């Protein structure tokens, strides 16, 4: 093997080792954001739901501050149920990483029939939450709250 080939091989190995230490990004959350935009016809940016109340965003605890926050609590619980399914219990198959097939037609969301059991469950979690977000009032006072004192 030529020295140049060894250098290329070494560079590839180092790159792969570095990539292995980078946590994977939740691919499904991108789809969930698109579902939210479909259901609310783009009236409110998805980022407004990332840090709302006690449950919208990472984690969640306490009592939901309003109906919109309750939508997020139900969504969190739905993802928790998905994680218990045997079909969702293998590497990178859980609700945060497993992508699914769906359609958006004029604000109507449909999970496609070609989803396996896990994908169908996750898709329905996201669909239900997106519809809930679209029909529930948004209270600006509940965005970016102090969760330590209010939740």
Curated annotation (Swiss-Prot):
This chain belongs to the protein called Acidic phospholipase A2 3
Q: What class of enzyme is it?
A: hydrolase
Concerning its family, UniProt says:
Belongs to the phospholipase A2 family. Group I subfamily. D49 sub-subfamily.
Residues noted as binding Ca(2+) in the record, renumbered to the chain: 55, 57, 59, 76
Task: Give an example GO cellular component term for this record.
Answer: extracellular region
Name the PANTHER family on file: PHOSPHOLIPASE A2 (PTHR11716:SF94), PHOSPHOLIPASE A2 FAMILY MEMBER (PTHR11716)
Q: How is the cofactor bound?
A: Binds 1 Ca(2+) ion.
Signal sequence coordinates: 1-27
Taxonomic placement: Eukaryota, Metazoa, Chordata, Craniata, Vertebrata
Looking up PROSITE patterns in the UniProt record yields: PA2_ASP, PA2_HIS
Q: In which tissues is it expressed?
A: Expressed by the venom gland.
The UniProt catalytic activity note for this protein reads: a 1,2-diacyl-sn-glycero-3-phosphocholine + H2O = a 1-acyl-sn-glycero-3-phosphocholine + a fatty acid + H(+)
Q: Chief localization class? A: secreted
Q: Which cysteines are joined by disulfide bonds?
A: 38-104, 54-151, 56-72, 71-132, 78-125, 88-118, 111-123
Q: Which UniProt keywords apply?
A: Calcium, Disulfide bond, Hydrolase, Lipid degradation, Lipid metabolism, Metal-binding, Secreted, Signal, Toxin
Q: Where in the cell is it found?
A: Secreted
The source organism is: Tropidechis carinatus
One Pfam family name from the record? Phospholip_A2_1
What exactly does this protein do? PLA2 catalyzes the calcium-dependent hydrolysis of the 2-acyl groups in 3-sn-phosphoglycerides.
Q: What is its EC number?
A: 3.1.1.4
Sorted alphabetically, the Gene Ontology BP terms of this entry are: arachidonate secretion; fatty acid biosynthetic process; lipid catabolic process; phospholipid metabolic process; positive regulation of fibroblast proliferation
Q: Name one GO molecular function term.
A: signaling receptor binding
Q: What residues sit in the active site?
A: 75, 126
- Cofactor(s) named in the record: Ca(2+)
């Amino acid at each position: 093997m030529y020295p140049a080939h060894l250098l290329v091989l070494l560079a590839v190995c180092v790159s792969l080792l570095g990539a292995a230490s980078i946590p994977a990004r939740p691919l499904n959350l991108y789809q969930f954001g698109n579902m939210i935009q479909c259901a609310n016809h783009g009236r409110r940016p998805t980022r407004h739901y990332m840090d709302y109340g006690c449950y919208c965003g990472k984690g969640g605890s306490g009592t939901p501050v309003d109906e919109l926050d309750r939508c997020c609590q139900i969504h969190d619980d739905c993802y928790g149920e998905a994680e218990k399914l045997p079909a969702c219990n293998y590497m990178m198959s859980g609700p945060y990483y497993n992508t699914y097939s769906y359609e958006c037609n004029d604000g109507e969301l449909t999970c496609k029939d070609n989803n396996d059991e896990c994908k169908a469950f996750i898709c329905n979690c996201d669909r239900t939450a997106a519809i809930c977000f679209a029909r529930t009032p948004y209270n600006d006072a509940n965005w970016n709250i102090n969760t330590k004192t209010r939740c």
